[in-house]
Amino acid sequence: MKKDENLLKDLWFIAISAAGGFILSLTGISIGWMIGTLIVACCLAMIRPAWLMMAPDQKGINRRWLALGQMILGIELGQKLNLSVLSVLKDHWFSVGVMLILSILLAMLSGYVLWRFSKTDMMTSFVGTAPGGLSAMPSIAQEVGANTAIVSLVQMMRVLLVVLSIPFLVILIYTKQDRTASAAAETISSATTDFRLAPVLWTVILILAAWGACKAAKFLKFPAPWLLGSMLGVAIVHVGGAAVTGHDMTAWWLSQANHVSQVFLGATIGSKMYKSMFAGVTRIIIVGFVSSVGLIAAMFLSAVIVSELTGISLITSVLAFAPGGIAEMATTSVTLHADSTFVVAVQVIRVILVIALLPPFYRLLHHLHGEKKDKKSSISGSSA
């Protein structure tokens, strides 16, 4: 009985929070559902109105919603690793490698700046500036013990700056190229909304692969196992299926699944926020804004250099380097006749690498930093 009551309360909280997501989605921003839901959920969690039926000591809604949101997101990300992406990686491995390494190094430099010049802790700073996507990084922040409120704020700021500035910037430098662009939907995901037997069966196989991989990732104590496990499980099965058949297997996958994932993630993360998380937020916003602008400027400069060295068009290079907004960058690349397959390939591979590799690295960095602090305190204690 109590379980049913808690489930209804959770659904009530998610439904109200999702209204904010729906309103912001009308702006056309691809992560509007996540941002709107997160903002409303955060406000509700801090105000706790009586009609919300949320106990004063309740620490947010059940974590199962976060796991479900992560799993849906992981399945979607895993499907993006298709033959087109692998073909780009094979043909342009040097250019892609340089872009990925520079992107991650510049993001880490941005995190270091945020850590040194604001009062936030090291883990929060690095996770907050990692270019792994607004949908993924706040949930990873929960897993690694970072401040989810600050991570969400910094990620939100960076993604909005990228989405609002990069497309206009490349339009200013746009010169028509005699190159045909792939369809954005085809580049972004091998999925269809047509309800046919073969795509539905393939979807069931992908979901089962995601579930099994999530359980394995949880057993192996991976960070964000529901996200990382489902993403890797689906990617392996998806690429394996394509290798056997010689073409990308098509799954039945509605675009609304992404919206549902964003709502679950935004509502869960927002529900666990409290006022003390925003201590010193003004300074963090200022430093975060400056570091995000610096990151975008550095990425743009790097894109110019890579374009000169490799012969990739400047517009393609800038859109591929942009630290966030996969859907927006893909759409812009198609509109401006840039190489949309290359743009999405670099963006997708970077997100997958960041989600898979950086959390363990941050944990190690955090551990080493903690040991260094302990050593310093023991030395100062013995000298006293």
Curated annotation (Swiss-Prot):
It holds the Pfam family AbrB. Keywords: Cell membrane, Membrane, Transmembrane, Transmembrane helix. GO terms for biological process: regulation of gene expression. Signal peptide: none annotated. It is a multi-pass membrane protein. It is found in: Cell membrane. The chain crosses the membrane at residues 11-31, 33-53, 66-86, 94-114, 153-173, 197-217, 224-244, 284-304, 309-329, 342-362. Belongs to the AbrB family. NCBIfam families: Gneg_AbrB_dup (TIGR03082). This is Uncharacterized protein YhjN. It comes from Bacillus subtilis (strain 168).
